[in-house]
Structures are given as C-alpha cells and as structure tokens.
C-alpha cells in the first residue's frame, strides 16, 4: 500500500515536471529551461565555445544533475500535497455505496436501489440500516452514527426537522425522511467536487507573490544576459554554464519551488480539521480576520440546553403548570422540547395526542421566538420574555424578576403564557464550554474583535459575555442582526468571520469574508458559506482563524528565508564567477579558493535546502497567538537572520567536504 502511494507520487512528480505543467510556476519554469540548456552545453560544449576539458565536463554534469534535482524536488513537494488531496477524495468516495432504500409508493414501502432515488422521495429507514441519501427527518427520531463522515464516534440524536447525510447509519429506532438531493448531487458528491476544485485555485496573495517572484526573476535574467553581452563587448568569452549557475543562485528558487505546495497544503490542513473549504481564498481570508461573530448556543456554551426546573406563577397550581408545559412542548421535537416533556414526566405528568384534540401547533421560528398551541378559545405559548411581552402585551413583575434571576445564573428563562397571562417559567441550563474563555483570550490577543449574537435576554447575554470576556454582545438577536453586524463591520474596512446553520443565516454567510456553515444546517446555508464543518462544531471557526494565520505566516517566513538565502549566495557565487577581478576578493567572506568547487557547493545547498523545507511547507510554521509587531520581530530573527547565516555555514561545510573527498576542478 505504501509502495503504491510512493509510486503514484513519483508519477505525479514526473507529470509536474512537464513544461506545460511547470510553466504556471515562472521561477521553476526558468530553472527547467536552464536545465535543458545545461544538458545541451554538456553534450555540445563547442557550440557555445565553453571549455571542454575533462574537469569542466565533470562540472557541467554536476550542474545538470543538481538542476534536475532542484526541479524534481520542487515537483515532488507539489505532488506530496496533491497526494494528500487525492487521499481525502478517495476516502470520501469510499462512503458512496449503493444500498436498498424503502421508498413510500402509494402509501406502502417499496424497495429500490439508492441510485434510483429522486429528490422529494419519502423513505423509511430502520434501525441499523444505512441512510440511502441526504434527507430531512419528517417523522420519528433516533441516533445516527456519522463517524464515517465527521469522525465523531458518538452517535447524534436526529429529530423532526434535522438533516441526515447519505451513507451514515441509523443505530436506534425508525425514522422517515424526505430526500433533499438526487444521486450525484448529494453532500458527499459536493464535498468531492469541492476538494477537487479547491486544489486547483490560486489565492490572491499567492498570485501577487507569484507576480513579484516573476518580476524578480525577469530582472535577474536580464542582468545575467547583460553580463554575457558585456563580456563579448570587452573581448572576453563568458562561460555560459557559469552564467546559468549565477542565474539560478540569483532567482528565488527556494520559495518558487515550495509556493505551489504551500497553497495546496492549506486546503489539506483545513480538511484535517474535518472542514471543507470551497477555495483557498476563504482560508487566506481567515488569516486577516478583524471581527468574529459568535453564536452563544453551541459555540460559547455546550449547546444542549436542558429543562431543569419549572416555576409556576403565583396562584397557579404546580401540576396544572407542568401540564401546560407538556402540552406546549408535545409537538416540539427539538432537544429542548423533548427535555421539557421528560421533566414533566418526571413530575408525574404525561400527555397524549388525545389531550391536544382541537389544538393546532405553532412551530418555533427565529423571527417570532416562541412556539406552542392554540385553539379557537385557548392558547398556551412558550418563548422569550421579550417576544411574549411584545406579542401578547403581558406584564408581570414576579415573572420578570424570576427570569432575571435565572439569567443571572447563566440559565435561559422560558416564560409560558396562557390566555393572556403568565402561567410560569421554565428554566433551561446550558454550561459554558470548558476552555472557551482561554480561546477567546487568544483571539483578542490577535487584535480580533469578538461579537456574540444571542436570542437570550439582555441579562443572560451580559452574564455570558462577562464570563468569557467578549468585546460586544447583541441580546434578543434575530438573523437580520447578524447580517447588520457584518455590513457594519465591513463598512469600517474590517474583515468578518461568522458561523451559521439556518436558511436565515445565508445572507450574512454570503456577505462575510469567512462564512462557516454547519454540516447539519440547511442547504441554503451550506451554499452561501465558503467553508463547511463536517462535525457541525461552531467553535471550529476559531481553529480556522488560527490556521489562516499559520498559512500566511508560513508563506511569509519561507519567502523571507528564501530571499535571505539569496543574499548569502551572492557572496559565494559572485566572487567565484568573477575570480579574474581581484577587487572582488574582499566579498569572498568564506575564503573559498577554488571557484568551481565554490559554485558547485552553492548549487548543492540550493538544491538540498528545498528538501529540508518541504516538511515546513506542508506542515506549516508553528503559530502562537501574539501581536503583529511581535510576530514580525520573531520571523525576522528566525527566518531573516537564519536565512542569512545558514547558507554561509552550510556552503562552507559542503565546500570543505568536497575538497576532503578530492573533488577539485
């Protein structure tokens, strides 16, 4: 298996060396053209009038080999990155299996192949069966094993309204789903397509750096060609092979060789977090984020609010209030609704559909912020205090004080209104995620503004915000508020990142510079976002920002190191090539007396440094959250100063080794 992987990467390396492929990397294209010219000079030295003694022919052969290895190692780094992308695609393709689906036809289940399903089909899935296609749960509930897609070993509870992904497995109960995609356009199909497309796109910064490197390369090409012309003018014959070595030493081959690999590695590293990025631009944007918009539930808190206590209003019987809560939650298939039913049941109250005859269900929406039951003469509604007061024009000092007390404990108060009066309050509790305070502190240390949007009241929002150290919060938030925050921050020339999972989040996700949609969210949210988290963990937005910073720093660090390398190589190559000018001996700081061995030593270093930097290009520079000024100082010291010192030491050691081995040309 490992041999096949090495063989595939070797073939991919050879493919990347083809001129029609490598031409997209101007620096390495020029290096490859120099290789072809070197082969020609070695084969026909008399054509260019260069020395053709045995000593020089050995030197020419060494140059040919080293230039070949330079191009080979560059192509290999890209092939290794592309190999990882292919592995991700192959792992996703393994999940596409054909299974039998139980489709409802004329009221009865009929077995068909999953490839024959169509969007809108109603399908029954039984315990321990593979879910045949993407869909929405319309009846029943059960735990679904999504480990093959998300990597999460714990089964996830799915209730009415939740989405399920084809190829995952139902491990309990029975559910009925409505297919939301045709075969070939399922979630996994789209993920495969996204991975394939993402690897081929260059980011704006990468394009800008490529243009800069191309311009630098063109300047040095003109300088080298000018030396050839000037030498002829003064009646001297320049050694073309020496000029090729000078050119390769002058141009930024190190970053030129590794730049494509860094770009592809960015997509791969995001995939390691179980996140699919639609483009490299999204990852790059993550490194420049100024404002991050966070949801409270699921991001700052654990996200599994449970009913822990019911408080009846003054004059309302306990059992009667428990019954109201159970009735209002009977058709509420959210985890919160189910927990309210369970709490009522633990207090001896059970209700059935018979008890709801004559009532119609009012589903919860993020706009209204309430749900419940109503009939011609009766209604029981539960929701946020702000929404209920606004809708039903009710007020009660005791209830409001109770809601404030619950909020100050970090809980969520759900008041219940019965026929124009507050009947009581349900208390939900959701714990703050362990470590989230430290993560937010790291975000703020990078000068990133943190804003929390929550549907909870002012007191709860203020409590949570103070607990974790947020810069700003928006209480009683509606989906439009997220969009307004995105617009406001962008008008201030700030780059914005946010998380969303609902259709009403789609406009804000599309407008944000980094929009992270949840895998269990709606199709509209996934299409609007530029990243999708397969684990549906909103906290990962912070990981994406760290990763974006790391990728930008890696590219900058390697560019700094490459250019610093070139400066050092000038002090080796130029005195060696122009040894006939004694005045240049003062810059021969390494005291390399044999010019050809000195040039060869520099070229060997130029080649092997690419190999040593491949792991850094693929893995990224270690990033610790800090201010931009501290980061700049650190990179200049390590990669700037290091880029100058390392070549001096390495080239001197290589020179001494060659001389010790008797390589004296």
Swiss-Prot record:
ATP binds at residues 332, 336, 364-371, 382. Its EC number is 7.2.2.6. It is found in: Cell membrane. One of its GO terms (molecular function) is ATP hydrolysis activity. One of its GO terms (cellular component) is plasma membrane. Pfam families: E1-E2_ATPase, Hydrolase. Part of the high-affinity ATP-driven potassium transport (or Kdp) system, which catalyzes the hydrolysis of ATP coupled with the electrogenic transport of potassium into the cytoplasm. This subunit is responsible for energy coupling to the transport system and for the release of the potassium ions to the cytoplasm. The system is composed of three essential subunits: KdpA, KdpB and KdpC. This is Potassium-transporting ATPase ATP-binding subunit. It comes from Thermoplasma acidophilum (strain ATCC 25905 / DSM 1728 / JCM 9062 / NBRC 15155 / AMRC-C165).
């Amino acid at each position: 298996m490992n041999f096949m992987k090495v063989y595939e990467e070797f073939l991919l390396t050879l493919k990347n060396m083809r001129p029609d492929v490598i031409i997209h990397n101007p620096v390495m294209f020029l290096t490859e053209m120099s290789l072809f010219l070197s082969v020609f000079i070695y084969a026909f030295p008399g054509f260019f009038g260069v020395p053709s003694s045995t000593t020089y022919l050995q030197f020419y052969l060494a140059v040919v080999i080293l230039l070949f290895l330079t191009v080979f190692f560059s192509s290999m780094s890209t092939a290794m990155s592309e190999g990882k992308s292919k592995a991700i695609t192959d792992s996703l393709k393994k999940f596409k299996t054909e299974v039998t689906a139980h489709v409802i036809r004329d009221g009865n289940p009929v077995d068909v192949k999953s490839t024959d399903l169509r969007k809108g089909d109603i399908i029954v899935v039984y315990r321990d069966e593979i879910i045949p296609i993407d869909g929405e749960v319309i009846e029943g509930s059960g735990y679904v094993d999504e480990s093959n897609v998300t990597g999460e070993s714990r089964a996830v509870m799915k209730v009415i309204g939740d989405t399920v992904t084809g190829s995952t497995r139902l491990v309990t109960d029975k559910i009925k789903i409505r297919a939301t995609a045709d075969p070939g356009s399922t979630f996994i199909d789209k993920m495969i397509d996204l991975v394939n497309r993402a690897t081929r796109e260059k980011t704006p910064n990468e394009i800008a750096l490529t243009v800069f490197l191309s311009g630098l390369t063109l300047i040095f090409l003109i300088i080298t060609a000018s030396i050839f012309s000037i030498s002829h003018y003064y009646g001297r014959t320049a050694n073309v092979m020496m000029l090729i070595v000078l050119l390769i030493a002058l141009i930024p081959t190190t970053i030129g060789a590794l730049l494509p690999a860094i770009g592809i590695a960015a997509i791969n590293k995001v995939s390691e977090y179980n996140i699919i990025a639609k483009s490299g631009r999204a990852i790059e944007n993550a490194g420049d984020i100024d404002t991050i918009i966070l949801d409270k539930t699921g991001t700052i808190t654990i996200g599994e609010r449970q009913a822990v206590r019911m408080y009846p209003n003054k004059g309302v019987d306990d059992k009667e209030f428990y019954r109201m809560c159970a009735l209002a939650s009977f058709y509420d298939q959210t985890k919160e609704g189910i927990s309210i039913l369970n709490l009522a049941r633990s207090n001896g109250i059970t209700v059935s559909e018979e008890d709801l005859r004559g009532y119609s269900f009012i589903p919860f929406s993020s706009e209204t912020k309430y749900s419940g039951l109503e009939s011609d003469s009766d209604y029981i509604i539960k929701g946020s205090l702000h929404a209920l007061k606004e809708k039903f024009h009710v007020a009660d000092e005791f209830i409001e004080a109770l809601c404030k007390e619950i909020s100050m404990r970090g809980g969520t108060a759900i008041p219940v209104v019965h026929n124009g009066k507050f009947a009581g309050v349900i208390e939900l509790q959701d714990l703050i995620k362990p470590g989230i305070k430290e993560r937010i502190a790291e975000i703020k240390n990078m000068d990133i503004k943190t804003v929390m949007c929550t549907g909870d009241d002012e007191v709860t929002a203020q409590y949570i915000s103070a607990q974790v150290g947020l810069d700003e919060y928006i209480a009683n938030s509606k989906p439009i508020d997220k969009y307004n925050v995105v617009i406001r921050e962008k008008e201030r020339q700030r780059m914005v990142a946010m998380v969303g999972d609902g259709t009403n989040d789609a406009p804000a996700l599309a407008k944000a510079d980094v929009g992270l949609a949840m895998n269990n969210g709606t199709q509209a949210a996934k299409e609007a976002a530029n990243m999708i988290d397969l684990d549906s963990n909103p906290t990962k937005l912070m990981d994406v920002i760290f990763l974006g910073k790391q990728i930008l720093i890696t590219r900058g660090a390697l560019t700094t190191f490459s250019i610093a390398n070139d400066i050092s190589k000038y002090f080796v190559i130029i005195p060696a090539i122009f040894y006939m000018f004694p005045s240049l001996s003062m810059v021969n700081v390494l005291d390399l007396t044999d010019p050809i061995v000195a040039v060869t030593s520099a070229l060997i270093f130029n080649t092997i440094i690419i190999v040593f930097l491949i792991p850094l290009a693929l893995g990224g520079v270690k990033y610790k959250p800090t201010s931009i000024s501290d980061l700049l100082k650190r990179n200049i010291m390590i990669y700037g100063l290091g880029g100058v010192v390392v070549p001096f030491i390495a080239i001197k050691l290589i020179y001494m080794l060659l001389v010790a081995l008797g390589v004296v040309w």
